[in-house]
Every structure is written in C-alpha cells, then in structure tokens.
Amino acid sequence: ATLRLDLDGEPLELHRPALPRLIVLGAGEHAAALCRLGAAAGFAVTVCDDWALLVTRERFPDAAELVVAAPHEYLENLDSPDARTAVCVLTHDERLDVPALRTALRMPVGFVGAMGARATVARRAMLLRSAGVTDAELSRLHSPLGLDLGGATPEETALSVIAEIVASRNSASARPLRDGHGSVRRRDASSDSCAVRSA
C-alpha cells in the first residue's frame, strides 16, 4: 500500500509491505480464535468454509476476507500465493480437508498445517497418500498443528498455532529465549516495516 504524505512541504511516499496472509479453512470455534489472534499478530486473515451460516462478519469481525466455497476450490483459484502465505486446515472433515491439503501442499506457500488428534493425523496421512500426495509433499505438513504449550481453550490453541507459523517463517527453534545465547533479535525488523522515500 502507498500513502502520500506532506512533511515540511515536501511530498513523500510511504510504502507499507503487504501483510502476510493467513488462510483459515473451516469456520468453527477454533477458527474464530485463530482469526482473532492472527489479525492481532499482523496477518491478513481469510476464512473459508462451504457452510454460509458459519462464515459471517459477526463471527469473524477481524477477517480481511470471508469466503463461502469448498476449501480446495478456493485454494485452486487463490491469487498470488507466496512464501508469506500460511494455510491452516481446521475443517475436521476428511471429505474437505484431504482435497484441501492435497491442493495446499502443491502450492508455493510457506506453511501448511492441519488440526487433529494423532489418530486423525495418521489416518489423514494415509488418505493423502492414497490421493497421490508424495512423501516429499507430506513432509511439508505441520500436523498436529501448533506448538506444545499445554493449552486447551480455542484461544490457547490459536496462540500455539500462530507461534508455530512465526517460528517456521523465521526458521527459529521455538525454544525459550533463556535457553539460547546471543542477541534475542534474530532478524532485521525493517523487512516488515515501512519504507519512506521522496516522491
């Protein structure tokens, strides 16, 4: 986005990088919590579900985009997915999540995750392989989704998911900072900041 400013009579352009994208497939309670925390963490959140009764502005006031569609069909038509795009599958229905994951794992996105218990994860991996997903593609999948924070509520679960996405994006260990050495700032924050130049 570009914004023109006038500082001391001299026009400037303020260039703000586009927000990283978080695509949440499924519109249950965990999705609502993930949308809230994702938006607060600086993501442009899209929520997609094939059930229109769930995909409402009242339930997802912080979403940048609400989509009523089959998740895999939405992904197939996604505009400009890139390494700053994270896809999280929270549909809890293998008829939806298997085709969505098969599509997502073949896209140039930076993160693909799926919620589920370990038994669900194992069965889903079997179904994905049966659907033609290779072991190399399957190795990209973060599932069960989230870091082990010991939480139980949708909000605590969402926090663990956002933490895993950020750690993955930065190739970070996700260990406590007190167990590390050196600077706590691992990267140049200017990569996500605004750049100002004279017009």
Model-derived segments and spans:
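Short acidic/glycine-rich loop or secondary-structure boundary segments that cap or lie
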Residues: 54-57, 75-77, 96-98, 121-122
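Segments forming oxygen-rich coordination pockets for charged ligands
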Residues: 1-67, 82-86, 126-127, 168, ...
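Short amphipathic alpha-helix with an adjacent loop that forms part of the alpha/beta core around
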Residues: 72-83
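ADP-ribose/adenylate-binding Rossmann-like module
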Residues: 48-49, 86, 91-95, 101-128
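Adenosine-phosphate binding glycine-rich loop
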Residues: 109, 115-199
